[in-house]
Amino acid sequence: MHPSVVRLVKPRRPERITSPILPPLPLYRAILRAHHRKLPQELRYLGDQYVKKEFKDHKKIDNPLHIVGFLTEWQDYLKQIDGGSWSHGKLSKDDLDKMSPEQIGQLHELMEATKKIGEESI
């Protein structure tokens, strides 16, 4: 084929903009490795415990939409940790409005735990 014709041919399937979702176990291990490489010791312990609890709690989920949502959010978290943007992250009002009361409670507990760690290191 001529080079000009090749440019006119469309791909059979659209290109994927986002990266594919990692399976649960490799994602879990990658998060723990990222914690080890990127987080301070105190935050790493807190983060590891939280990740272990969340993955254990979601182990028995059957709904594919919940599984995809869970893995997608944790993969986004992994990108934040690897990219170093975790320390500058802010929660928008829209994100907060989407949370259930239980999630807001978990967020508050996490905030209190990180404050205690910050006070101990001073």
Curated annotation (Swiss-Prot):
Gene Ontology CC, one term: mitochondrial intermembrane space
Pfam hit, one: Complex1_LYR_2
Transit peptide: 1-47
Alphabetical GO biological process terms: carbon utilization; gluconeogenesis; mitochondrial respiratory chain complex II assembly; regulation of gluconeogenesis; succinate metabolic process
Primary subcellular site in the record, as a coarse category: mitochondrion
Compartment list: Mitochondrion matrix
UniProt keywords, alphabetically: Chaperone, Gluconeogenesis, Mitochondrion, Transit peptide
Domain of life: Eukaryota
InterPro entries: SDHAF3/Sdh7
UniProt family annotation: Belongs to the complex I LYR family. SDHAF3 subfamily.
Purpose of the protein: Plays an essential role in the assembly of succinate dehydrogenase (SDH), an enzyme complex (also referred to as respiratory complex II) that is a component of both the tricarboxylic acid (TCA) cycle and the mitochondrial electron transport chain, and which couples the oxidation of succinate to fumarate with the reduction of ubiquinone (coenzyme Q) to ubiquinol. Promotes maturation of the iron-sulfur protein subunit of the SDH catalytic dimer, protecting it from the deleterious effects of oxidants. May act together with SDHAF1.
Assembly information from the UniProt record: Interacts with the iron-sulfur protein subunit within the SDH catalytic dimer.
Name this polypeptide is given: Succinate dehydrogenase assembly factor 3, mitochondrial
Source organism of the structure: Candida albicans (strain SC5314 / ATCC MYA-2876)
Gene: SDH7
